[in-house]
Design a protein with these regions (language model features):
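Short, charged low-complexity linear motifs
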Residues: 2-3, 51
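Enriched for short, Lys/Arg-rich terminal
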Residues: 3, 12-25, 61-91
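PIN-domain endoribonuclease scaffold, especially VapC-family toxins
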Residues: 5, 25-33
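Residue-level recognition of oxygen-bearing side chains
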Residues: 9, 54, 88
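Short alpha-helical linear motifs
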Residues: 30, 51-54, 69-72
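A short, surface-exposed loop/turn module that caps and links secondary-structure elements
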Residues: 34-59
Length: 91
């Protein structure tokens, strides 16, 4: 099991995401639980990012929405950075 660390940006974006997408609140909460239990589960579609976001990873909430994160396997820690639409989090 991993420890989730919410960055200040993630706290703001998670609140905004939940308010603007109430229909996805349960799905978002389930994704966070799944990340905490095992971020390598295939349905999360964990992938590393490239370019200026190199060093970060992303998982899917739905087809259009992503959570960006830093995965520290040795420390069993995941730092959550942002959540939002594909184009928003990859800007």
């Amino acid at each position: 099991m991993y420890r989730l660390v919410w960055s200040s940006l993630f706290s703001r974006s998670a609140k905004r995401f939940s308010q603007s997408h109430p229909e996805l609140r349960q799905r978002f909460a389930q994704v966070l639980r799944d990340i905490e239990n095992d971020p390598l589960q295939p349905h999360l579609r964990l992938h590393s990012l490239k370019g200026r976001m190199q060093g970060l990873h992303a998982v899917s909430v739905t087809y259009n929405y992503r959570v960006t994160l830093t995965l520290n396997v040795t420390e069993q820690e995941i730092i959550l950075h942002d959540v939002g639409a594909h184009d928003e989090v990859y800007e």
